[in-house]
Structures are given as C-alpha cells and as structure tokens.
Amino acid sequence: MSGGARKAAFVLPTIITVAVIALIGTAVLQYRQDRSDRIAEAEKIGAAFFSDVATFEAEVQRELSEVRSGEPADLKKVVDAKLEDPPVLASAPDGAEASKTYRAAVKAEPMVLDPYTSLSDKLGRAVEAKAFVKAADDVLDHGPIVLLGYGTVFDSGPLRKRVLPELNRSLAEFRAVDVPKGAHDVAVKVDGALTYVIGQVDTMADHADDGKSYEFSYNTQYNAARQAVRDYATEVDGDVAEALDRIRGAKPT
C-alpha cells in the first residue's frame, strides 16, 4: 500500500470517529435541554396549582364572611358550592418528579380539601343539631307547672284533660325528631325526664280521684336533661368554630 493510501486509511476512521462523537454530544445536549424544559413545565404546573389553592381558600373565606345570617345551613351551602369546583393539579410531562414544586403539589393535593370537607360535615351536624336542640328545649320548657300553674290540685280533671294530653303530645313530637349522631344519650335524658313527669302526673290524678294528697318534684330530671342539651349544643358549636379556625389558618403544604 502506498504512503498516500495508508494516510487516507488512518484519516478516514478518525473523521468517522469525530463525527460519531459530535452526534452523541448533540444528542446529549438535546436530551438535557428537553429534560430542563420538562422540569420547567412541571414547575409552572405545580406553581399554578398552589396559586389556585390560594385563590380557592380566599374565595371560601370571603364568601363565608358575607353570610349575614351565620346559620349553619347557609354556611354549608357556600362550602359545598365551592367544593364542587376545587383546585385540581394538572398532569405534567415525564420527569416532573424532578421538580420540587410539582412534587410538593402532588403531596399536598390529596389533603388540600380536608379542612373544607371537614367543615361541611361539621356544619351538616350543626344543622341537624339545631332542630334537635330546639325540640328538646321546647319539651323541657313546657313542664306541668307551665301547663297547670302553681298551687294545690284537688280535681283530676285539669290533669287528665289538659296536662297529660299536652305532655304526651310533646313527648310524641320529640320522639319524631331525628336524633343526630352523638346525641343519643341526650335524647334518652330528655325522653326520660318527660316520661317521668307523665308518670307522676298520672299518679297525682289517681290520688286526686281518691281524695288523697300527692306531690312530686321533677327538678332533678329536668335540670339534668337541660344540662345534657346545653353540653351537646356547646360541643357542636365548638366543633364548627374549630373547623372554621382551621380553614382560616389553612396553608398548602
């Protein structure tokens, strides 16, 4: 092989090698650029999610503050309406896990609505509790003394014709009221207090028919029932207040 041919033989592989290295280098650079673009896109998606969350939180708090009545039912309507259109984390390109902001958004998304769903639940309980507490208060506010007045009873007529029918009607109405979760023991106390009074009034009527004296007190039963109702109402109100405080301090993680 001549000198020129040998030189060409060595130069050609070198040129090919250089070309291959150049192509590989270009591919690596392109991959890095594509990866950088995907991460940047994921950052934008994550940031947009947190921005939507902040807007959602601000809107809920603003709309709740505009509810003049302060009634649990009205507050619940606001929360439930907002929960129908919650912030949603958009899908991201491959490699999004390399984005710190997107990873944080993925972690936060499952818990973002927790304070609001909890508030909705607490408000729903408060709505039920309000009707129950009112029914219990009405029953306990219309005892025998309210219906009959103070004094000595000599005739069973008013007891049988007015007091007992009214007490039995009140008991039936109370028993027809839905008992919210967590209020069963309260309902038992109220029911028991009224049942006790009905039994005592019936016994008093029998004694009046026989010309015998009879007296009874129902303060212990009624006071215990009233306290149970107050404690239950306080607990429900406290749960709502706590849930409201939680959303006021809610921050995406």
Please annotate each region the language model reported:
Residues A27-D34, T55-R62, E66-K82, P86:
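Extended alpha-helical scaffolds
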Residues G46-V67, A98-T253:
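C-terminal amphipathic alpha-helix
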Residues P72-D114:
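Intracellular, membrane-proximal regulatory regions of polytopic membrane proteins
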